Regions:
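Structured, basic alpha/beta domains of bacterial-type, RNA-associated proteins
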Residues: 1-19, 23-148
Length: 148
């Protein structure tokens, strides 16, 4: 029985596990969507949520704590500038895990961990791009799909 057993070992020693999770957290924050195995996604979900909560604090101490975990300064900047404002009104539940089925090579159960609302941001950017293309085509007097 697994009573009172917390956390995921992920078949690694402590240092390798910590490095793996730090890399996953950094990638989720930078790319807003990562495909990995289900146990890794479950292990990284609370860490990503904790980082976003830390980003909402926006103090020097919070920035230094985030820099301890995240690998790149760009991810720290994105966390505090972009994600903290996006999730300002939300209290937790910043990530979702979507199961994708077994991986072809080894049959491992694969999942996608993504930030909630990231699909809306990407969709809005795509809509703005298409609208700009339509307006430019209308100004030039041609159909939107035609090449110049």
């Amino acid at each position: 029985m697994r009573h009172r057993v917390a956390g995921y070992k992920l078949k690694r020693d402590g240092g390798a596990r910590k490095s793996l999770l730090r890399g996953l957290v950094t990638n989720v924050i930078e790319q807003e969507r990562v495909i990995t195995t289900v146990p890794k996604a479950k292990a990284v979900k609370p860490l990503v949520d904790r980082m976003i909560t830390l980003g909402k604090a926006d103090t020097l101490h919070a920035r230094r704590e985030a820099a301890r975990v995240l690998f790149t300064p760009a991810s720290v900047k994105k966390l505090f500038d972009t994600l903290a404002t996006r999730f300002g009104q939300r209290n937790g539940g910043y990530t979702r895990i979507v199961r994708l089925g077994p991986r072809k090579g080894d049959g491992a159960e694969v999942a996608m961990i993504e930030l909630v609302g990231s699909e809306l941001v990407k969709r809005a950017a795509d809509r703005a791009k298409r609208k700009e293309e339509r307006e430019r085509a209308a100004r030039e007097g041609r159909e939107p799909g035609e090449d110049e």
